Amino acid sequence: MSDQFEKLLTTFQHHLEVERNLSVHTIRAYMGDLTSLVEHLEKLGLNDISTLELAHLRSWLANQGVKGGARTTLSRRAVSVRLFTKWALKNNYISKDVGATLATPKGHRTLPAVLDVQKAALAMDSMATRAAEEESPISLRDVAILELLYATGARVGELCGLNIGDIDYNRNTIRVLGKGNKERVIPMGKPAIKAVQVWLKNGREELV
């Protein structure tokens, strides 16, 4: 690595440590990405950061993909470069932020793993046993939360937004506000209703 690039990366690392106050792990990852970029640039014959172009960055990122880099890793490397070029422009090392439009590769999305019936039942039993042993408001609350999640399939965010009045004990339903402020009415079983009632009676007042 040339002296110019080495000094540049050292200055940028100081910026990450002092001004951005990033974690050691994050800084190590960013600097590893930028070291890889600089090595690629030097192979292309680029030794002056002021001549950096978007094509150089795309070439490097594509090369990382050919080497088998995971999409999540490529995404982080794109972030590293954009952070660097933004800083370089601000400090007059380059005349335009060539990394601003560097696309972040989309990560591969997989369906979340789900519990089978036996594991779900085991989790419920374990929580109920703990609540019975501890007799604490928090344990009763946790049982109610777990029962509601299992019985209704509601999202965690939806559950966090619930009010006591959203539960209809006569119809055994619960009203949740989902994405896009769309309201849904979901049926719920007796175990969930009982867990909520026990928590309201024996635990809620101590936590409010």
Locations of regions flagged by a protein language model:
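Conserved catalytic core of the tyrosine transesterase superfamily
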Residues: 1-208
